[in-house]
């Protein structure tokens, strides 16, 4: 079976393991985008350490879960967000986060993958990849 969206698969795997109260999740296949998204989630304190395991194919990522995720998932289609959109959070973004202060959007910008809070500090826009709260 072909995996059409590895990022959606990774975020769903994390969410499912979190709901089952597992201490770790194994994500496969691994990619640079998934690793950068995990770094953004780790920086916000939603997940613990993670480790890339090279198995000679596409690799695996073992993520330590902390039990702090209520919901996470991909945003499809990937909406482009301008800097001004991040300040007001348009309607199609509000359906992913419960409020302006709770949770983060994960955005791919020209300076790398970061949360929407970091993008507001940097004053740049990007493309919405996923959400976590």
UniProtKB/Swiss-Prot annotation:
- What GO MF terms are annotated? rRNA binding; structural constituent of ribosome
Q: Which PROSITE patterns match?
A: RIBOSOMAL_S8
Superkingdom of the source? Archaea
Output one GO BP term: translation
Entry GO terms, CC: ribonucleoprotein complex; ribosome
Q: Which UniProt keywords apply?
A: Ribonucleoprotein, Ribosomal protein, RNA-binding, rRNA-binding
Instruction: Report the HAMAP family cross-referenced here.
Output: Ribosomal_uS8_A
Q: Which family does it belong to?
A: Belongs to the universal ribosomal protein uS8 family.
| Described purpose of this protein according to its UniProt entry | One of the primary rRNA binding proteins, it binds directly to 16S rRNA central domain where it helps coordinate assembly of the platform of the 30S subunit.
How does this chain assemble?
A: Part of the 30S ribosomal subunit.
State the name under which the record lists this protein.
Small ribosomal subunit protein uS8
| Organism of provenance | Sulfurisphaera tokodaii (strain DSM 16993 / JCM 10545 / NBRC 100140 / 7)
């Amino acid at each position: 079976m072909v995996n059409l969206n590895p990022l959606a698969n990774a975020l769903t795997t994390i969410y499912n393991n979190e709901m089952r109260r597992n201490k770790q999740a194994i994500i496969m296949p691994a990619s640079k985008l998934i690793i950068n998204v995990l770094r953004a989630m780790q920086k916000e304190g939603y997940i613990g350490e993670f480790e890339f395991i090279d198995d000679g194919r596409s690799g695996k990522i073992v993520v330590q879960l902390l039990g702090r995720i209520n919901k996470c998932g991909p945003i499809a289609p990937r909406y482009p967000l301008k800097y001004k959109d991040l300040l007001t959070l348009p309607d199609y973004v509000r359906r992913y986060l419960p409020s302006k202060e709770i949770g983060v959007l994960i955005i791919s910008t020209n300076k790398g993958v970061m949360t929407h809070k970091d993008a507001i500090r940097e004053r740049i826009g990007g493309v919405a990849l996923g959400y976590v709260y």
